[in-house]
């Protein structure tokens, strides 16, 4: 009796890692450009609702734990690395599910982009500032955008999957 080894159902990691690498590259290049061109704390109006700024975030989303004394740098770094490892596992296991994997790759690219900042600088560089009048949304970066878009795609993919199961 002969046994044949079948290919894992998930498929290749390469395309999904490629998406993550593209996110990381664009994120890091934009942060480097903004840090070279703008002074810390400066604000440059681009449109009536949008500024480019240079601010540092030692915390997480919305500056959560930004004033925590330093331990958060390592906690958020560990969380980002753990997320990337879990995402690699999920990408390998579900590699044929295009929307699901695109969402995960965007999240992983964003997480690693911010981990790089934390490791290199001890903070995340944020520079996109949207506002209405005097009210400003917290500044963010391309990594944050990729994470948000990836999360929205995960929700959309799950809603689509549940609707298709009916």
Swiss-Prot record:
Gene Ontology biological process terms in this record? proteolysis
User: What highest taxon heads this organism's lineage?
Assistant: Bacteria
Q: Where in the cell is it found?
A: Cell inner membrane
Mention any one GO cellular component term assigned to this protein in its UniProt record.
plasma membrane
Coiled-coil residues are none
Q: Which UniProt keywords apply?
A: Aspartyl protease, Cell inner membrane, Cell membrane, Hydrolase, Membrane, Protease, Transmembrane, Transmembrane helix
Q: Which reaction does it catalyse?
A: Release of signal peptides from bacterial membrane prolipoproteins. Hydrolyzes -Xaa-Yaa-Zaa-|-(S,diacylglyceryl)Cys-, in which Xaa is hydrophobic (preferably Leu), and Yaa (Ala or Ser) and Zaa (Gly or Ala) have small, neutral side chains
Q: What is its EC number?
A: 3.4.23.36
**Stored NCBIfam families:** lspA
Its family? Belongs to the peptidase A8 family.
How is this protein named in the record?
Answer: Lipoprotein signal peptidase
Organism for this UniProt entry: Paraburkholderia phymatum (strain DSM 17167 / CIP 108236 / LMG 21445 / STM815) (Burkholderia phymatum)
Question: What lineage does UniProt assign to this protein's organism?
Answer: Bacteria, Pseudomonadati, Pseudomonadota, Betaproteobacteria, Burkholderiales
């Amino acid at each position: 009796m002969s046994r044949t080894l079948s290919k894992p159902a998930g498929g290749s990691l390469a395309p999904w890692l490629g998406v993550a690498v593209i996110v990381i590259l664009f994120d890091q290049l934009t942060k480097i450009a903004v840090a070279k061109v703008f002074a810390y704390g400066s604000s440059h109006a681009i449109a009536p609702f949008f500024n480019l700024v240079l601010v540092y975030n030692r915390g997480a989303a919305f500056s959560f734990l930004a004033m925590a004394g330093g331990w958060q740098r390592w906690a958020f770094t560990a969380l980002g690395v753990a997320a990337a490892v879990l995402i690699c596992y999920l990408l390998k296991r579900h590699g044929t599910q295009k929307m699901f994997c695109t969402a995960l790759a965007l999240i992983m690219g964003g997480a690693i982009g911010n981990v790089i900042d934390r490791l290199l600088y001890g903070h995340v560089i944020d520079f996109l500032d949207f506002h209405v009048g005097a009210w400003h949304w917290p500044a963010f970066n391309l990594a944050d955008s990729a994470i948000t878009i990836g999360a929205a795609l995960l929700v959309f993919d799950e809603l689509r999957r549940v609707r298709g199961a009916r």
